[in-house]
Amino acid sequence: MAKGSLNLQDLFLNQLRKEKVNVTIFLLSGFQLKGVIKGFDNFTLIVETDNNKQQLIYKHAISSIMPSKPINYMAQAQNNQQASQQSNNNQG
């Protein structure tokens, strides 16, 4: 992916992680997990459940993620874009 382009999945997951939003994760098998996203990478999520247990979930097993409240993931995208523009201005 080109530098400066937006990755919606990462913006969304990072905002959920930073705000510690409770989520319901629906797996392809029909199973549901409820908890807070503690971290993620290209292939996995780490979710902490209500009983303080952590689970590593592979993204290919996820159908959808439903936050308990609306997420403003575009605010982070705009902040990233502004920081990138300032960095470019300082270099030139």
UniProtKB/Swiss-Prot annotation:
GO BP terms: regulation of DNA-templated transcription; regulation of RNA stability; regulation of translation, ncRNA-mediated
Keywords: RNA-binding, Stress response
Keyword Flavoprotein applies: no
Residue ranges, annotated region (Disordered): 73-92
Keyword presence, RNA-binding: yes
Domain Sm: 10-71
Alphabetized GO MF terms: RNA binding
Low complexity: bias regions: 75-92
InterPro entries: Hfq (IPR005001), LSM_dom_sf (IPR010920), Sm (IPR047575)
Pfam families assigned to the protein according to its UniProt record, in alphabetical order: Hfq
GO CC terms, sorted: cytosol
Task performed by this protein: RNA chaperone that binds small regulatory RNA (sRNAs) and mRNAs to facilitate mRNA translational regulation in response to envelope stress, environmental stress and changes in metabolite concentrations. Also binds with high specificity to tRNAs.
Assigned protein family: Belongs to the Hfq family.
Quaternary structure annotation from Swiss-Prot or TrEMBL: Homohexamer.
NCBIfam families found in the cross-reference section: Hfq, PRK00395.1
Descriptive protein name: RNA-binding protein Hfq
Gene, per the UniProt record: hfq
